[in-house]
């Protein structure tokens, strides 16, 4: 899988920001077909940081109503990437 197609976007929530402060962990939305090895290689290549571990979660899409009709958001995959000591990753740096 191409390195640029593995990482989709950062998953920025209040809970994710608390985890990043305490354990040096970054939460990222990744491609559903990507495995932990591909995610680790993509983060290390694109952001020039050292990764200690990667944990992944398959998140089920929610059922939503669109007027009278029911629809479903797509399933997606979330990765918790733990960076090495002294490494940092800030998505909002310019």
UniProtKB/Swiss-Prot annotation:
Annotated protein name in UniProt: Large ribosomal subunit protein uL23
Assembly with partners or alone: Part of the 50S ribosomal subunit. Contacts protein L29, and trigger factor when it is bound to the ribosome.
Lineage of the organism: Bacteria, Pseudomonadati, Thermodesulfobacteriota, Desulfuromonadia, Desulfuromonadales
Keywords: Ribonucleoprotein, Ribosomal protein, RNA-binding, rRNA-binding
GO cellular component: ribonucleoprotein complex; ribosome
Gene Ontology biological-process entries: translation
Homology family: Belongs to the universal ribosomal protein uL23 family.
Xref: SUPFAM superfamilies: Ribosomal proteins S24e, L23 and L15e
Function: One of the early assembly proteins it binds 23S rRNA. One of the proteins that surrounds the polypeptide exit tunnel on the outside of the ribosome. Forms the main docking site for trigger factor binding to the ribosome.
HAMAP family named among the record's database cross-references: Ribosomal_uL23_B
Top-rank taxon, per record: Bacteria
GO MF terms held by the record: rRNA binding; structural constituent of ribosome
NCBIfam families assigned: PRK05738.1-3, PRK05738.2-4, PRK05738.3-2
């Amino acid at each position: 899988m191409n390195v640029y197609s593995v990482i989709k976007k950062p998953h920025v929530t209040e809970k994710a920001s608390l985890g990043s402060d305490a354990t040096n962990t970054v939460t990222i939305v990744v491609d559903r077909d990507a495995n932990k090895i591909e995610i680790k290689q993509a983060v290390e290549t694109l952001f020039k940081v050292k990764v200690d571990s990667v944990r992944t979660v398959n998140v089920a899409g929610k059922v939503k109503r669109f007027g009278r009709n029911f629809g479903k958001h797509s399933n997606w995959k979330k990765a918790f990437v733990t960076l090495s000591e002294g490494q940092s990753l800030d998505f909002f740096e310019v």
